[in-house]
């Protein structure tokens, strides 16, 4: 049995749906929102790699590496901002972050 593109797209759709539901169902915890965004980016990368291997082109795989790099930087910067915010405010709830408007 061969794993076709439909299998990859199904897994990618499930990951994307989990990420979107994670954002909409849990709006109070910033860390869960960041993890949900990472799930969405992972599903996009899986689509890039699946279509790239299906079409025999390496552009999708190279673009997936760029997206992974940007996602890692986004996660590192987001977590660093959350650590500083937690040290200053004592909480990382989304309601407290919205108060920080400058």
Swiss-Prot record:
GO CC terms, sorted: NADH dehydrogenase complex; plasma membrane
Residue ranges of the TM segments: 5-25, 31-51, 66-86
Membrane topology: Multi-pass membrane protein
Entry-linked InterPro entries: NADH_UbQ_OxRdtase_chain4L/K (IPR001133), NUOK/Mnh_C1-like (IPR039428)
GO BP, one annotated term: ATP synthesis coupled electron transport
Keyword check for NAD: yes
Pfam families tied to this protein: Oxidored_q2 (PF00420)
EC number(s) from the headed UniProt entry: 7.1.1.-
Subcellular location: Cell inner membrane
Predominant place of localization: membrane
Catalysed transformations (reactions): a quinone + NADH + 5 H(+)(in) = a quinol + NAD(+) + 4 H(+)(out)
Keyword list, A-Z: Cell inner membrane, Cell membrane, Membrane, NAD, Quinone, Translocase, Transmembrane, Transmembrane helix, Transport, Ubiquinone
Database matches in NCBIfam families: PRK05715.1-2 (NF004320), PRK05715.1-3 (NF004321), PRK05715.1-5 (NF004323)
Subunit structure: NDH-1 is composed of 14 different subunits. Subunits NuoA, H, J, K, L, M, N constitute the membrane sector of the complex.
Functional summary from the UniProt entry: NDH-1 shuttles electrons from NADH, via FMN and iron-sulfur (Fe-S) centers, to quinones in the respiratory chain. The immediate electron acceptor for the enzyme in this species is believed to be ubiquinone. Couples the redox reaction to proton translocation (for every two electrons transferred, four hydrogen ions are translocated across the cytoplasmic membrane), and thus conserves the redox energy in a proton gradient.
Family the UniProt entry places it in: Belongs to the complex I subunit 4L family.
Name of the protein in its database record: NADH-quinone oxidoreductase subunit K
Taxonomic classification: Bacteria, Pseudomonadati, Pseudomonadota, Alphaproteobacteria, Hyphomicrobiales
């Amino acid at each position: 049995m061969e794993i076709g593109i439909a299998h990859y797209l199904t897994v990618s759709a499930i990951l994307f749906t989990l990420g979107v539901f994670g954002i909409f169902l849990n709006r109070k915890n910033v860390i869960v929102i960041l993890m949900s965004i990472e799930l969405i980016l992972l599903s996009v990368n899986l689509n890039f790699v699946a279509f790239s291997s299906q079409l025999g082109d390496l552009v999708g795989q190279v673009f997936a590496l760029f997206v992974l790099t940007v996602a890692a930087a986004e996660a590192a910067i987001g977590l660093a901002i959350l650590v500083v915010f937690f040290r200053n405010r004592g909480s990382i709830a989304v309601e407290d972050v919205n108060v920080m408007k400058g």
